[in-house]
Amino acid sequence: MTGMLGAGGWSDGKLVVSTVQGGQLAKYCGEEKAMSLMEEVVANFTRFHPKPDEISCSDPKTEPDFIKPYFDLRMSLVWHIGSNYLHEIAKNWYSFLLDKGVNFHWEKEVVGIHFENNDVRYGDPGCGCRAAHMYYDELIFAVGKSGIDFAQSMSDRYKLPTEPKAVQIGIRFEAPQKYFQKLIDVSYDFKLYQKHDNVSIRSFCTNNNAAYVAVEETYGDISYNGHAKKGKEFENQMTNFGILMEIKGIEDPFAWSRDAVQKLQANGTGLYYSPGYTRTPSLTSEGNRVSTIQTNSLAPISLALGEYFAYIVNFIDNMNAVFEFGNDWGFYAPEVKYLSPEPLVKYEDLSLNDFPNVHFAGDALSARGITVSGAHGIYIAEKLIK
């Protein structure tokens, strides 16, 4: 274990309350219960927030006409926590759990789980030592994005029945906020959406006002995300968001995504493109230049993403028709959401059919947001704590 709260609770800071975004929840417990669980997640973040009055929300109700005919707008309630408060929230939450007697095993690597013996085997990373054993009565298996390959290995080992997931890959787009202000006034975390035959494409995880691009490292490869801080001292009048494709029909989505991401690496980091070098990579919230290699050609991105890159180019062209930002933009590549096939679980407690004391949650159950991940955990806990 090397962290807590996941990417959504450590660097993103936006809680999306929706039964159609962020992963499967309502199919297990129904719409009303799903909304209640997600509201409890919001309440937990509020409870441990050092300045809860700083939390703001966006709740759009109608689509604006000016995005037609190019886009649909996916509307949902979004709570903006402020990424500069997340570390304090995590520390407050962690202290609360310690006071309640929860044990944490830091800097330990789980090397195997034997569901049939209720046995978790773990040790110090890279030491080659004999693994220690921890036995459990109930197990909540809730790996983060960096544990998707481990989740896949467990699924393969036990031949778990699964539901295949689509590839989720694209780029992190960035431009001055002024071009998007009329849409931001409607929806802070706007999600523009297009549907094609086997590909859907959407804007994702929008950040405004004090918006910064974040570098992520997963499996030794660099990808990009974004976050927004709260407070005028952080404002940079920039907007960034992912442009993510959901590609169906690829035989091994995880392997395909890994290969595409590796093709987008250069000198130990990712790529940045701006037409005609109009823009350069932006500064992080710490004042450093975002780690990336600037390229004057779209060819390496096109080579990595193949025929699917045309959907991203079309999406940007359509945005330009609506928001008229000309060449005043850039993007970082790649942005990726690794998803392994979703295990089929019992609806009443998210447990495996053959191992009723093993419950899957979060990324292990193909969640794509901290709100749904947290709701998975609460839903399971309600069943376990009588």
Task: Enumerate the language-model features and the residues they cover.
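Residues forming the flavin
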Residues: M1-K14, S18, S56-K386
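Electropositive, gly/pro-rich neighborhoods at or near active sites that engage anionic ligands
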Residues: G22, F48, P52-S56, L244
